[in-house]
Amino acid sequence: MSNAILQYSLYLIILVLLAIPLGKYIGKVMNEEKVFLSKLILPCENFIYKVLGINEEDMDWKKYSFSVLAFSAVGFIFLFALNLLQGVLPLNPEGISGSSWDLSFNTTASFITNTNWQAYSGESQLSYLTQMLGLTVQNFLSAGVGIAVLFALIRGFTRVNKSGLGNFWRDLTRIVLYLLVPLSIVLSILLVSQGTVQNFKPYEEVALLEEIVLDDGNRVTSQIVPQGPAASQVAIKQLGTNGGGFFGVNSAHPLENPTAFSNLLEMLSILLIPAALCFTFGRNIKDKRQGRAIFIAMFTLLIIALCIIGVSEANGTPQLAQNGDVNLGYIDQSGGNMEGKESRFGVVGSSTWAAFTTAASNGSVNSMHDSFTPIGGMVTMLLMQLGEVVFGGVGCGLYGMIAFAIITVFIAGLMVGRTPEYLGKKIEPYEMKMAMLICLATPISILIGSALASINPEILNSLTNSGAHGFSEILYAYSSAGGNNGSAFAGLGANTVFINVSIGLIMLFVRFVPMIATLAIAGSLVKKKKVATSVGTLPTHNLLFIGLLIFVVLLVGALSFFPALALGPIAEFLQMIA
């Protein structure tokens, strides 16, 4: 147990030590200040502005929103066509045919929205061109869009009596050039050094060391080893909280995540930028205490989730504990729940990844969440159901938590009978309506989607498990879509018209509705003047506010999802211990 605590602590300490300086760097990128990469990248940046005709025009929130939607729509059309037509396009050594219309729609919606839900297996259903030119490019762009919207919101707090929130095209260009590309290059090289594949070779057939005899008597003497440009996609899928694996089993695949060191790199990359953005927020609003307060709230929720998942998976189930074949060589010490986990990562590496990937809207996996204990699986589900605000996706996680902060100061204002304020700006009914829209988009979409799927005979027949766990598989799928996460309980037959279309629509809804509402809040705040701090102003940087913020986040999650969780993982847990 002490070794496990040491590992958990080490992961978290490294994360904090990396996030603080990166947050300062991102703040400089946002403000177009000089950074150490400026001499190298500035000529490329200016060339892009010149070729595309991008100027320094300040956009109001409506124009910024239109730019976000128009850019995403163009990306949607391109990626949808690429999925349909990949069979007649180059860089397809395996001759993989185009995807069906519904799978193409689902995949396109998934990657445009930074969700990366995968109803396909990459090595058998997508060509190198689609993976590289389609999915990898969208991993960069969708992450950049989320961070750009956060930048606009920060400007809404810092600017006074204005209407402009910055220029979307300049924000997006700088985020990709100065942040996402450099980090991805470094991580890609490190992953290749560990054995992650990066090539354009055809798949290779290799002889097995020991042949396999099937039940029907046939003998298998060889296997197909997939190839491809995986490392470059894996790097940005982690850094951009995208999560879609190059291979079907994601980062549980030995060619995508070969070693314990690659596992550490990929795992830290999940939360690196979301955590750093908290410090960017504090720096750029010129009050670092505010950024630290939000970081501590997120970090506290992450630690609670990590502890519950870790203890649950380490203890296993009563059935495993009674089985003398699963132990670590010590008397009466269970080996934990190793079902669905890679032995090279173990319970600690798998539990940490599960907490990180569902706290962020990443969704990549190095173990199968469907095989987690009921409580461990429930916590991963709840992290998504909270709206992906425990760090969450790059950009969108922080602006989601800021929406909760606005609700928190409003509730506190009602308690003391004062007009609520946040960061020197008055919070009025318009901001509250938009904040509630941000916070309610996720639970509404999850619950409606899960309810419709639960009464669909086609979906029920596709489940590999019945009863409480079968319902959990449905609830997890729609929680993943509603949280823009992308991970799954794998027992659900995902590649059906109903699942592809319904989940695709939910992903689009929960991505763009909160995004536009966030820009609307920014557009309202930027026009307001700063309010002087008074005796009655609620401090939003102390432990009291942090506690209130955590309480509000958990309250919304508990009230919204407890009935559904009671029918799924909680019922399964009670059945298990009965």
Swiss-Prot record:
The UniProt record lists the keyword Transmembrane: yes
Membrane topology term: Multi-pass membrane protein
Annotated GO MF terms: P-type potassium transmembrane transporter activity; potassium ion binding
Description of how the protein assembles with itself and partners: The system is composed of three essential subunits: KdpA, KdpB and KdpC.
Stated family: Belongs to the KdpA family.
Job description of the protein: Part of the high-affinity ATP-driven potassium transport (or Kdp) system, which catalyzes the hydrolysis of ATP coupled with the electrogenic transport of potassium into the cytoplasm. This subunit binds the extracellular potassium ions and delivers the ions to the membrane domain of KdpB through an intramembrane tunnel.
Protein name listed in UniProt: Potassium-transporting ATPase potassium-binding subunit
